[in-house]
């Protein structure tokens, strides 16, 4: 009996010694939330994943005298179809999965609901997809509650509309110079939600001031699968340009049918689906000449970090990142704030996030007093991209520097669809 006890004691001692020096690595849990079955959520995840891999490989995040590895938690929000599902997903991420930080989101209504959950729990939440201005104005209206919210991407709806109007102006100038149509007719096609409604209001107010005529407004569901009726009506209205505001899956059937029918109107604006390489295959090549606002394009260099990131993303995932992959910069911004704070305490990290002055992949990222990302020359501007014969290329800001003297290497000329030229050329 004594012999058995000695053996057991020795076995325990061996196990104890074997365990020495193998302290479990400390981790920081970051929840990445979005519609994971769609490119928006996929790119939220891919962007964060790439940053986390780079940071962990380089040693992790230094917090005081401790070093932490990043642990990402993928959270499917299903927000394109259900705000309630999105809210529940955010709550599970925080209360069940135990994430310390949250980033992602795409649909403004859903992000607003998720924002409330994060604020209830004093969890820092980085917006990486929703553009509604109201998400950030809450910060100044009730700072103590909403100070944990920051938007990294995209720029807000006001600036999005401004960039969209620059793309519209570019197409209109081509129509004026090449086709001799001095007052182009514009059809507004925007999905029916907060984002779409905001864009419609802005477009109705701005387009006439740009020397163009609005011939109608069409607002399909963001999840529409057939836009034949809308496109037929737009053609019947005699539109020369379709100004789009599409963040949801409807962007694929829209562009495919536009190209198939060869609707004689240039398509410009925002079509998130067209920001992804899979768009070409998904539309069977019929999305050729579609133009959309984006953040990234092959061979376009906004900062010294842009091309290395895009190239790495393509090498890893096989596609060009959409703006939702701004989670990549977000993880690095969070790392910097945590290390400057020397703490994981949310209030301490917020103080450092407010000081952010970070040259990232889309430009210099600085937050204003509403915790919104600053837009304009010297900061984040976004770019215009167009599908040209199977390649997604950058076309705005123009290569001649005519927009506020901003020039990015790799920009090429915008092209009108040949069927538009054939229809309207005198």
Locate predicted features:
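Short, low-complexity disordered leader/linker segments with a strong preference
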Residues: 1-29, 94, 419-426
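Immediate post-signal peptide segment of exported/extracytoplasmic ligand-binding proteins
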Residues: 20-32, 62-71, 175-184
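Beta-alpha junction/loop-to-helix N-cap segments that form part of ligand/metal-binding clefts
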Residues: 22-25, 40-46, 61-140, 152, ...
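Extracytoplasmic "Venus flytrap"
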Residues: 31-49, 75-83, 106-109, 189-198, ...
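Short, polar/charged alpha-helical segment
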Residues: 41-63, 201-209
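Extracytoplasmic ligand/sensor domains, especially the bilobed periplasmic-binding protein
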Residues: 99-215, 266-292
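Extracellular/periplasmic periplasmic-binding protein-like sensory domains
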Residues: 132, 136, 154, 258-328, ...
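Segments of small-molecule ligand-sensing domains
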Residues: 312-324, 335-402, 426
